[in-house]
Amino acid sequence: MSERSDAIAAAQKCLDEFMAAFNARDVRSFERTFNFPSVRLASNTLAIIEPGYHKPEMFETGALADWHHSAWERREVIHAGADKVHIDTRFTRYRADGSVIGSFDSIYVVTCEN
């Protein structure tokens, strides 16, 4: 495999672990998929995320109150280098009965820091 394909495989694995930990509501494992500080731009808000930013309570209120699980609908690599991969994604949030809460487009920049 090439450096580029290795980086893509590692980035996709990171996103798999990210989603699995999120769906398990395992905040500690979820945060292990991040490099800190992490930057999130969503809903016209810029957040600088540091370790401990995510709390178990986040699954009980707000946008996640009705949420049961999420799934990737699309993950397309739009740029890849040896230590950074940009992935155009779409994920869908579901309720326990399988009905859709919403689908969201996002670009993830996955970096290899350590």
Predicted regions and their residues:
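Short, low-complexity N-terminal intrinsically disordered segments enriched in polar/charged residues
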Residues: 1-36
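A solvent-exposed, acidic/Ser-Thr-rich amphipathic alpha-helical stretch
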Residues: 27-83
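Acidic surface patches and DE-rich sequence motifs
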Residues: 42, 95, 113
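Hydrophobic beta-strand positions
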Residues: 77, 93, 109-110
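Structural motif
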Residues: 82-86, 107
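Generic short beta-strand segments
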Residues: 88-94
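Short beta-strand edge/turn micro-motifs at domain boundaries
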Residues: 101-114
